Regions:
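Short, acidic/polar N-cap/turn motifs at the starts of alpha helices
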Residues: 1, 22-24, 99-103, 121, ...
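Metal-centered catalytic cores of metalloenzymes
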Residues: 1-2, 6, 28, 43, ...
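Short, compositionally biased "basic patch" segments
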Residues: 1-25
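Beta-strand-turn-beta hairpins that frame and shape the catalytic cleft
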Residues: 4-9, 29-33, 104-112, 127-131
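Metallo-beta-lactamase
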Residues: 15-19, 32-35, 41, 52-55, ...
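Active-site HxH/HxHxD metal-binding segment of metal-dependent hydrolases
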Residues: 40-107
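Internal catalytic-core helix/loop-beta-alpha segment
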Residues: 95-125
Length: 200
């Protein structure tokens, strides 16, 4: 685990089939630390999560529950996801304790609805620091650019494009993706470049 931004830490798990990293995040906050989309944690990372404490585990979408059950078990932190995605993850064996809704505040972030990949996908935006954390709304691949997942894995491609177009209107300098490489500068421009490729 390393500090990618002040107070935001990340660790990765490489996906051979995809050819890029899946990323988990730990965000320090005075009201309690947040763990976002926790990927498989090596022993030292799991020990650190336990030592530093996690107040809440928040999940961006139904496919990013990942190792939330393990982190919940070890830290005692409740797991939250949007209710539209909750039934699917419960069927997969995930334990969900709370709901996330667009407009809600979670630590330093505003919860932003980005449906399309799944009906309940959310992102986390910190306007003060111009940071956006996403799950599957966009991926950081190829490195330095942003792209969408293949349409066959999207519930509603047109709705996702509309969601991403709305993200491009936010004030964003840094984008931290659940999948792929982070964009640490000019992320708003990378989002707008992606939106410019969408069909009219």
């Amino acid at each position: 685990m390393h500090e990618i931004l002040p107070g935001i830490f990340t660790w990765a798990w490489f996906s051979e089939p995809h050819g890029y990293n899946f990323n988990g995040y730990l965000v320090h906050h005075p009201d309690g630390n947040l763990c976002i989309d926790p990927v498989e944690p090596p022993a030292d990372v799991l020990d650190r999560l336990v030592k530093e404490g996690v107040a809440r585990i928040v999940i961006t979408n139904r496919n990013h529950v990942r190792r939330a059950n393990l982190v919940r078990e070890r830290t005692g932190a409740p797991v939250a996801i949007h209710p539209a995605d909750a039934p699917y993850v419960r069927q997969q064996g995930a334990v969900i304790d709370a709901e996330l809704h667009a407009g809600q505040r979670v630590g330093p972030f505003a919860v932003v609805g980005v449906p399309g990949k799944s009906p309940g996908e959310v992102a986390f935006h910190c306007p003060r620091h111009r940071v956006l954390i996403v799950g599957d709304a966009v991926i950081g691949n190829p490195p330095g650019k942003l792209s969408l997942l293949r349409e066959k894995v999207l519930d509603d491609p047109a709705r996702l494009r509309a969601s991403v177009s709305a993200l491009a209107e936010l004030e964003v300098d840094v984008l931290l993706p659940g999948d792929g490489e982070p964009i640490l500068r000019d992320a708003g421009n990378r989002l707008r470049e992606l939106v410019a490729t969408f069909p009219p």
